[in-house]
Amino acid sequence: INHTRELNPSVFLNAHVSSHDCPDNEARAIYYNSRHFGKTRNEKRITRWGRGSPLQNPENTGALTLLAFKLDEQGGDCKEVNIWVCASTDEEDVIETAIGEVIPGALISGPAGQILGGLSLQQAPVNHKYILPEDWHLRFPSGSEIIQYAASHYVKNSLDPDEQLLDRRRVEYDIFLLVEELHVLDIIRKGFGSVDEFIALANSVSNRRKSRAGKSLELHLEHLFIEHGLRHFATQAITEGNKKPDFLFPSAGAYHDTEFPVENLRMLAVKTTCKDRWRQILNEADKIHQVHLFTLQEGVSLAQYREMRESGVRLVVPSSLHKKYPEAVRAELMTLGAFIAELTG
């Protein structure tokens, strides 16, 4: 249907949901190509998922989802789509082990063998504009080194920490993909002498991607806190039960000081996505009754949000993502800038 021979071409698809017990339905894929016909814009949609579809259940807001389209062997329109909507973090982890971090709101598309082949390097276009340090050709740099190098490539026209964070994550991720390509692509092109060699490399790539996904956001926040005058904090400080919250304010010493005012303590947990994962932070700092959670999650359902709030979790979300949340809760979301201002004011 990706053509302009007619206005708004469409095709009907048999939609089967493998992850949930619901009946098959006839969905409709349509290409609104009105711009070609003198109107405002073009966009593509899939509609008519049917009642009871997990794709339309608000409780699945933010869930990682796979859509597998069965291509017509003769080159005609696709007639079938198989759907998996992740219902748990365990399911999401299985997928991200194969393809690396899936950034909230991102669309990764292409032939199945490239996306889920175990060593997908093309989940995002690699930007070759960066001239990498020579010694990075011989060794894979640490996350801190990549962020330090990326600092000279950040957009300079904003002093808003919310905007800065998203820009810096984008630049740092571009550089990470370039370094990964530098170290892995030639090995893949040469092929493998055994299945064990392939598995070893696939595991190495997967582990590095997971490590980067887990630390990148924390490192960016640490740099931004310091730049914006928030210098009194501890990372990975030990609390009750040997727990290690991502950030404690103003310090680990203050947290353990029985005479320090409890109302002046803050804890910030960091999760790229918070659907279900938010429960992991509830007992990381027993003295702090309302904990803060920074996330890039693009929306949660009203029920999920109420459960977080009732459990003493306050969401900190970049300002540009607030519109992704239900209108009823937007006023209660904190921006990163507001969080920093509260602790530096």
Where are these regions (language model features)?
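Eukaryotic short linear interaction motifs
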Residues: 74-76, 91-94, 277, 301
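Long, contiguous, compositionally biased segments that the model treats as domain-scale units
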Residues: 1-64, 69-73
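Compact, glycine/acidic-enriched structural inserts
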Residues: 85-127
